[in-house]
Amino acid sequence: MSSEAKTLQAIKFDRETKTLDILDQLLIPYATEYISIKSIEDAYQAIKLMQVRGAPAIAIVGAFSIVVDVYNNLKETKEKSRTIGDLVESIHYLITARPTAVNLSNACLDIEKLILTEFKKDELVNQHTFDIVYQYSVALYDDDLDNNFKIGDNGLHYIVETLKSQSFTGPFSIITICNTGSLATSGHGTALGIIRTVFKKLSKDAGEKFWLEHVYPCETRPYNQGARLTTYELNYEGIPSTLVCDSMASSLIATLSKQRKVKSSTAPVKFIIAGADRIVENGDTANKIGTFQLSTIADYFNSRAEKENTIKFIIAAPRTTIDFKTKTGDGIIIEERPSQELTTLNGPVLTNNGVLEKQTVGIATPGIDVWNPAFDVTPHELIDCIVTEDTNAFVKNSEGDFNLKV
């Protein structure tokens, strides 16, 4: 485990030494420490404990963990006895760390398919096995980073065209949930990547007719990824932002729509942008719990607003997040997390002299029954646009359906 200054680099894979280190996101924003991942088991535990999270990031970490696992096994074991069947079994085990996020499953199954195309299950893992896994994983990382910048540009284009069609001028705000930035991906991010790009390229100082003035990250209970991670990234980038509780979204939108100040800003909310852990064929989207709630809030305000004052609900994700095998959201398996994530809070004790070690504090009646789904499913009917790395953002046709296969 290593410590260093504030950073947004969630994944460090050294292509020369074949070593993998991940930023322990449970410690952010109060500490920056990296954990060494030397095996598939290490990755499973880190993903399960949410030391690394975000659908693209866990897929990349999962793939790289197979790389270092095979590399270390070949380097350290004199008598080679590990079979391809053993490796495939370990890969299937890795998938179970986070079942809702399709990216991890897709990456692992892609690797399995590539391996089984070249080897039989009773053959031994060898250097060629490593080469196959390495080449796939490096390409996965590089493609994800490139695609995230494309998502940012495509999201910017959709936002500009939307505001032009509404004849909107002046400052506007965006709401987001969970963490979808550099910490959740190879870099830049998806939903937060769009926010980064929009803030950089739509500037009042540059003479634009409209500009992003403020971002409102929802805290994202019960794991507080918005409060811990998204605020960390927004602060790092110098993007003006105000943290709100998940239950404040309706009041926030209503207050700003009446040109009343929230802190120092009156810029109305024009967009809600969320990421995705799984998008199925019809556009139904599984994302962090609370996303569905935000879409219904937007729908409520839109039903009472003039067309030029509506709020667009945007999903941002790479195409690797799309699951064409599942037709509707009813087929998505929703992961349930441990009850103590809801009944306790974990964090460092803060004093005038600095930060003390992390402690756990109870906040609910001992023994109370708990339902703690990690994700919910937003129906495609409530989504205005799905932004991927494809040039054209996906909007619904006249029948209200997405065609994601185009």
Swiss-Prot record:
The keyword Hydrolase does not apply. The active site is at 277 (proton donor). Pfam families: IF-2B (PF01008). The record marks 178 as: Transition state stabilizer. GO terms for biological process: L-methionine salvage from methylthioadenosine. GO terms for molecular function: S-methyl-5-thioribose-1-phosphate isomerase activity. Keywords: Amino-acid biosynthesis, Cytoplasm, Isomerase, Methionine biosynthesis, Nucleus. It catalyses: 5-(methylsulfanyl)-alpha-D-ribose 1-phosphate = 5-(methylsulfanyl)-D-ribulose 1-phosphate. InterPro entries: IF-2B-related (IPR000649), IF-M1Pi (IPR005251), IF_2B-like_C (IPR042529), Initiation_fac_2B_a/b/d (IPR011559), M1Pi_N (IPR027363), NagB/RpiA_transferase-like (IPR037171). The keyword Cell membrane does not apply. It is found in: Cytoplasm; Nucleus. Its EC number is 5.3.1.23. GO terms for cellular component: cytoplasm; nucleus. Pathway: Amino-acid biosynthesis; L-methionine biosynthesis via salvage pathway; L-methionine from S-methyl-5-thio-alpha-D-ribose 1-phosphate: step 1/6. Catalyzes the interconversion of methylthioribose-1-phosphate (MTR-1-P) into methylthioribulose-1-phosphate (MTRu-1-P). Belongs to the eIF-2B alpha/beta/delta subunits family. MtnA subfamily. This is Methylthioribose-1-phosphate isomerase.
